[in-house]
A protein has these predicted regions:
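Terminal, non-globular segments
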Residues: 1-163
Length: 163
């Protein structure tokens, strides 16, 4: 049973990485905004498997994103995805205690924290107005959260958003 579950996670991981590669980007103030499907997958990993696997998978996702998209910031996404993997892994501990609204608030705050840390690292030493930074962080967080809600309601009847 454990081997079967492990193989399923590996296959889903490969599928999610392929989907992430082909997600279209849009431009906002000369900055590319790309939906982060990987953080949504980490949310489900944290909800169903816990911290350890979510941290490991977060690091793998992060270093993969670093190598593919931003070699100049090598390690930035690995750091943030690992840290957020720790936070999202907490979901399994409070699965039966927190209400759906509490879980949703926690997940949104984790997404917000993830993008705040990443863009703090990315914009360090670059003159980007704080208002643009806040807008980009907000857009990324809301976009990821909305995709999570749509996926959860459409494909997972007993997922993260259900009581």
């Amino acid at each position: 049973m454990i081997i079967r579950s492990f193989i399923q996670v590996i296959l889903l991981t490969v599928a999610v990485l392929i989907v992430q590669l082909y997600i279209p980007a849009f431009s906002f103030n000369d900055l590319d905004i790309i939906a982060d499907i990987l953080i949504i997958f980490l949310t489900y990993m944290g909800f169903y498997y816990g911290r350890f696997y979510t941290i490991i998978l977060g690091f793998i996702f992060g270093i993969t994103q670093d190598l593919i998209t931003q070699i100049d910031l090598l390690g930035a996404m690995a750091l943030t995805k690992s840290a957020i993997g720790f936070g999202l892994g907490t979901l399994i501990l409070y699965r039966n205690i927190w209400s759906a609204k509490s879980r949703m608030l926690f997940i949104f705050l984790m997404y917000l924290l993830h993008f705040m840390i990443f863009y703090f690292i990315k914009f360090n030493g670059v003159s980007v107005p704080i208002s643009i930074s806040i807008q980009v962080i907000s857009i990324h967080s809301f976009l990821s959260f909305i995709i999570l809600l749509v996926m959860d309601k459409s494909f997972f009847p007993h997922g993260v958003t259900s009581d």
